Curated annotation (Swiss-Prot):
PANTHER family: RNA M5U METHYLTRANSFERASE (PTHR11061), TRNA (URACIL(54)-C(5))-METHYLTRANSFERASE (PTHR11061:SF30). GO terms for molecular function: 4 iron, 4 sulfur cluster binding; iron ion binding; rRNA (uridine-C5-)-methyltransferase activity. This is 23S rRNA (uracil(747)-C(5))-methyltransferase RlmC. The active site is at residue 335. It comes from Vibrio vulnificus (strain YJ016). The lineage of its organism: Bacteria, Pseudomonadati, Pseudomonadota, Gammaproteobacteria, Vibrionales. The keyword Methyltransferase applies. [4Fe-4S] cluster binds at residues 3, 11, 14, 88. Its EC number is 2.1.1.189. GO terms for biological process: rRNA base methylation. It catalyses: uridine(747) in 23S rRNA + S-adenosyl-L-methionine = 5-methyluridine(747) in 23S rRNA + S-adenosyl-L-homocysteine + H(+). S-adenosyl-L-methionine binds at residues 213, 242, 263, 308.
Length: 376
């Protein structure tokens, strides 16, 4: 894939952009098999490939420059000058068009980007999420204070007229002078508060602060694969720990007698519950709890426990809890194979029966890995 930002060395996030995609897959596959050297070669299934461009449904843009010349993108690693990334080819074409419009809209609206050196200005980030099922957008302005809200509100009508697909608009207040992406306070500027997404016929509700996979094409296959594995095992009870907005639990519920989804973020749990209501699923329960605390409080494990932890992994304590609870099956989905490999060392009673990786982040070293572990 051709990328002008990579060719000009203005953005090097996609470190393997100039490597043929087939070679990227081979290199990543070999690296994962080496990392998980204890996993039998026969356990590995073929990797799930990504589209090489227009594959991301999220954009996180730093607001840079000045009010008369704002830039959405990143700072140059060489000299700190603003670099616009509104036409990054990983984004869909309608996302690129919207980002380019927003960059000009910020200028004509007179909204000053935040300057971290001078500690002045208002707009810190522009966060964009796209629903691939509906082609609709959620737009979030991360601002230092409420000072810019009047200008944002005043100029919203022409933004919405130019891009009626922008369904949800909000302002997130992040007053702290540090590299935090968002603050606690979310102010909605539209009647709609969430996006509707759909994978494999399963409705998903996306709210501003909920974690959501960034590559919808690959995410759909990740959920479908977990569903198929669970359908083969037919568990009586299943737990989905770190369930987020419920993607795995919602897909797997038809193939288990009871499914319990646990997630500490209450907003994500509210989204998951709404999806379950839309599907009319009666054997699925979601609770806003800490996954480790929930696991520790149980005296008897489910037949199958699915875990999808953040990049830090399960950690030794939770891994050892799961080892003691001794479910017959574990399905572990990870966005960080290194911490996943460390966690597996604390699960000595389990053998990896099936392993597959999903190229959620093409042109990088990152991979989403999912494994089926069976207690011996």
């Amino acid at each position: 894939m051709s990328c002008p930002y990579f060719e000009q060395k203005s953005c090097t996030s996609c470190t393997h952009m100039n490597t043929p995609y087939s070679q990227q897959l081979e290199t990543k596959d070999n690296a994962l098999r080496t990392l998980f050297s204890d996993v039998a070669q026969s356990a590995w299934l073929a990797p799930v490939q990504s589209d090489s461009m227009h594959c991301r449904n999220k954009a996180k843009m730093v607001a840079l420059g000045a009010a008369h010349q704002p830039t959405l993108g990143i700072e140059s690693v060489q000299d700190g000058t603003p670099i616009s990334l509104v036409h990054c080819p990983l984004y869909t074409q309608d996302s690129q068009a919207l980002l380019a419009y927003l960059q000009e809209w910020i200028r004509t609206s007179g909204i000053p980007p935040y300057n971290k050196v001078k500690k002045k200005g208002e707009l810190k980030f522009v966060l964009l999420t796209r629903s691939q099922a509906r082609g609709e957008f959620m737009l979030r302005f991360v601002v230092r204070s409420e000072a810019a809200l009047e200008r944002i509100r005043h100029n919203l009508p022409r933004l919405q007229q130019a891009f009626p697909a922008v369904r949800v608009i909000s302002a997130n207040i992040q007053p702290i002078h540090m590299a935090r992406l968002e603050g606690e306070q979310e102010i909605f500027l539209t009647d709609a508060h969430y996006l509707l997404e759909e994978f494999n016929g399963v409705p998903m509700v996306v709210r501003p602060k909920s974690f959501f996979q960034t590559n919808p094409h690959v995410a759909a296959q990740l959920y479908a694969t977990a569903r198929d594995w669970v359908a083969e095992l037919k568990p009586r009870q299943m737990w989905d720990l770190f369930c987020g907005v419920g993607g795995f639990a919602l897909h797997c519920a038809p193939h288990a007698e009871q499914v319990i989804g646990i997630e500490i973020e209450e907003e994500a749990i509210n989204s998951a519950k709404l999806s379950a209501q839309q599907l009319g699923i009666g054997n699925l329960r979601f609770s806003a709890l800490d996954s480790a605390a929930y696991s520790q409080a149980q005296t008897q494990a489910a037949d199958l426990i699915l875990v999808n932890p953040p990049r830090r992994g399960l950690g030794q304590a939770l891994s050892e809890q799961l080892e003691q609870l001794a479910p017959q099956y574990l399905i572990y989905s990870s966005c960080n194979p290194v911490t996943m490999q460390q966690d597996l060392a604390h699960l000595p009673s389990y053998q990896v029966e099936r392993a597959q990786w999903f190229d959620m982040f093409p042109h990088t070293d990152h991979a989403e890995v999912m494994m089926l572990l069976v207690r011996q």
